[in-house]
Amino acid sequence: MSSQRNYCLAGCLSSCILVILMSFSDAASFQYYQVPQQDQEYRMKTLQRLPSPDMLKALEYIENLRKQASRTESLPDYTSYQGAPFLSEQKDTQALSTDTAKSPTSDDESEWMRAMLEALMQAEKEAKVSPQEKNNLYMDKNIPPELIEDYDSNKWSEKRPKAGKFSSRLYDDYSRDNPLKRTNEIVEGQYTPQSLATLQSVFQELGKLKGQANNKRDRMEEDQKLYKDDEDDLYKANNIAYEDVAGGEDWNPIEEKVESQTQEELKESKEEVEKTDDMEDEIKRSGLLGLQDEEPEKDTKEQESENLSNLMNTYLNMWMNRMDKGKQNPDRRSLRFSGKELDPEAIYQLIDISRNLQIPPEDLIDMLRDEDGRKFGGRLESEKEVDVPLDLDEVTETMTDKTNVYKNKQGFVRQPTSPVLPNIPEGLTVEDMVNLMGADKLQNRFKQNNGLQRPYPMLSKIKGHKAIWPKESEKRQIEYESRPEKEEELADYVVKMLAKYPELLGNNQNKKMPIPYSAGDLQELEKQYENALRGYVNMRGYQDLETVSSSNRRLSTRENDDTQNKQYIDEDLLMKVLEYLNQEKAEKARDHSVKRSMENM
């Protein structure tokens, strides 16, 4: 009973396995022969669907069972698929099948198994692809076909190793001796998809490098082709001309000359191309250097401008300090010129010079007074040399705004109330001018001829309307006249004084304060000034005298007895001349200071 049960179980197992294997074999054969076209992806899939070694081991195990059941049947040779592992499995399975019994149906089943294995062997052989087809399959993936070849196609000796000769210890040595066993597994272990991808990327980069190196070669080849085409055209034309003249003789020496010429032209063209490349590289480098050099030039220019501004500020500060020193000693003024006699012609020359040189008369008087004061041990100190500071960045900056020029009601240009250099000695008035010109000496000269006296004081300003500017007489005075030699000498002297003392150009007229005098002093000064003006009017003519007297009469009617102040017409004239001539005083002072600073540098 036990033998029958074992036989039934073995039959059921074999039938199930046969059904499964037949389904696999039919599907493989149908899919392989169904596709007529050669599709690479499909072939790769079919190669992967071949029977695996595990399947073959299972089939061999079944055959071993059949052999134990019916020992008359011989086993097929499966060593090409699995090799030595079958030996150890055979020893294990022999003990299990000793009690199995024989039956008449076992022959049919063994035949079915043998036929099935033969069909599988044929399918494997047909599935093997030729080497040329393998090359076409793996060209796109940059995989060498040698790595994909199936080494099982090589036929080895069919001598099967005997079980008794080899022990389990020698199995590893035996597997190592045969280099073509399980080669597919070894190759798959060595070349993974990641390693293949890295190899592919390396080959692509090498191709790019080669492409960059070959660009120049391609250009040279194109140039050579163009030259060859030109040579062919020349050969044709020369051959035709030579055949017409010489009757078709050989053209070899001329061809050699043409070839030599073309070779020389090619060499020259190569040299020109190399030269142009070198020139482009030099131009690029020079452009970069030029951009780098422009920045330090700009920095140097900015530094120079800052240095000049700092120098100008230092000079202005020093001049202002000198003005402060002169302002601290206003009491030193004295009537040093009272001992000298001054003709009325000097007054006219002074006004004319101030008009022609556009310098206020007060500045001229100050310069003359300072020069004489220096001769007699005057108050001006010796001019010190200007020390330029070493570090120009430490110099304090001063604001030097432009002067705002505007016109008064009568149309004359007037300077603003805040001049460029405000620190100037104050208190210089018309009485100082009269005293400096020596009007007290002129009084004795004109008392004999003209004994007229002014009944009103002269040093106060007019409260009412000022005298109208005389049109014809002043137009004649404003006209430019040729200066005599004395006047030119005086002008040169004034220019020299201005060069030495530029601070005298900026007298502040709007901050003048009258110095208090006694009544007797005022009357004496009034008489002196009146006599000086009479002499001046006599020099200019009787017509001018009439205009001055009429204007003085109009002024006298508008004044009160003792409280109201009077002023001569010439004082108003001098003030207007000063207003007219001081319009460019600040600009000239600046220009002169800049010139001196540049000379000292």
Curated annotation (Swiss-Prot):
Lineage of source species: Eukaryota, Metazoa, Chordata, Craniata, Vertebrata
Gene Ontology process terms (BP): angiogenesis; eosinophil chemotaxis
Signal peptide: 1-30
Domain of life: Eukaryota
Keywords: Cleavage on pair of basic residues, Secreted, Signal, Sulfation
PANTHER family according to UniProt: SECRETOGRANIN II (PTHR15119), SECRETOGRANIN-2 (PTHR15119:SF0)
Gene Ontology terms, MF aspect: chemoattractant activity; cytokine activity
Family: Belongs to the chromogranin/secretogranin protein family.
Compositional bias annotation for Polar residues: 93-104
Sulfotyrosine modified-residue sites: Y151
Listed InterPro entries: Granin, ScgII
Region annotated Disordered, chain positions: 89-109, 258-307
Basic and acidic residues: bias regions: 258-273
Protein name, per record: Secretogranin-2
Keyword Secreted found: yes
Localisation: Secreted
UniProt function note: Neuroendocrine protein of the granin family that regulates the biogenesis of secretory granules.
Any GO CC annotation of this UniProt entry: secretory granule
